[in-house]
Amino acid sequence: MADRKLFALVSTLIGISIILTYTLSAYTTILFGVNEFHFAIRQTLFGFISIFTIWILAQGDPDKLLAPIGFTLFIGSAVLMIAMPFLPEYLVSAVGGAKRWIKLFGFSLAPVEFFKVGFVYFLAWSFSRKLGHHGGMGIKQEYIRFAPYGVVFIGAMFVIAFVQNDLGQVVVLGLTLLFLLMFAGSSFRFFLTLLLGALMFFLFFIFTAEHRIIRIKSWWALAQNSVLELFPASIAEQLRVPTEVEPYQIGHSLNAIHNGGLFGTGIANGTFKLGFLSEVHTDFVLAGLAEEFGFIGVLFVVFIFMWMIQRIFKIANRSDDSTIYLFSLGVGLLLSFAFLVNAYGISGITPIKGISVPFLSYGGSSILAASFAIGMVLMASKKAKMN
């Protein structure tokens, strides 16, 4: 039997997302001249489809369906991402010249969201054949053994970071890959060398795009005072950026969080959603949550989210199948890193990456892809010893 608690927790988060979409999209509906329930109705539709998808997948036989679904997501979405730059304008939506969404029946679908789930399954399936067999292996042999995955990852990251101009997804997938490598049995020394290599690639991606440099400067302008206090004055002045670099989004996000206080301003009573924070019902949903529902509301959502992750990790820990073990771990890591990257970004701890919050942010692609991941984990949970 599939894990009912996990199903209930995910359904709860989806229900919360519908409420947040309604209350936080007030200004956006006016801006676009649509009905006040426009985004809430769409998110409700996405929510019901997602819950139904989870339920259907949970009924499946993991021995027969898990691999076909995983590889279909991996290969199918990869092909779509590669083909998107060559598709006509009426089939794709572009932002800043980057084509990220495919238009289907009045909705936009982002293949990268489904690629992440398929990529995690591909890694789990591949790593499971090498699980725990690195003992006594030198670091050179480890690099040779895992080189094919590095090639696949670099190819995927090139498409996502350069073609689709989406570095945030690279960060989430890169972190997931690194930690899955460690759980798959690679040595700690190998893990550290890959981590350093990933950091070098990350810096390369940042400094090859002007808009990313501006975003880093915007974040650093806000964070620099508290950090530079730790350095000697001569070094601190060299690292300081001009104060005219305005961290607009981060500043308003922090103001929204501060304005919410302990108990919040109350549902629909938020101020910063009224044009001060763009996309507050998507990328800044946690800031909107903090303003209207306060610290208590955020704490409740974090509790539900952490409980969901705990159930996913429990399924992984109770499984004797190494593929299911690694896939469940990978899904838990993927969702956790997405949540953390968003939370750190809107609170000014790290630069904003444009990553949505799983099951909470408005958007069909994100919630549906995450639902595929949860549905596959629930399907796999029938092979785990949960009792």
Question: Over which residues does each language-model region extend?
Answer:
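Hydrophobic alpha-helical segments of polytopic membrane proteins
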Residues: 70-76, 147-160, 167-207, 219
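Hydrophobic alpha-helical transmembrane segments
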Residues: 45-53, 291-312
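Hydrophobic, glycine- and aromatic-enriched re-entrant/interface helices and adjoining loop segments
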Residues: 101, 194-295
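Interfacial segments of multi-pass membrane proteins
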Residues: 171, 175-190, 268-293, 355-368
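Membrane-helix boundary/helix-loop-helix interface segments in multi-pass membrane proteins
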Residues: 4-5, 19-22, 26-164, 343, ...
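Alpha-helical transmembrane segments of multi-pass membrane proteins
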Residues: 13, 47-51, 80-84, 114-125, 157, 173-177, 302-306, ...
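Loop-to-helix entry and N-terminal half of a specific, functionally important transmembrane alpha helix
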Residues: 312-354, 360
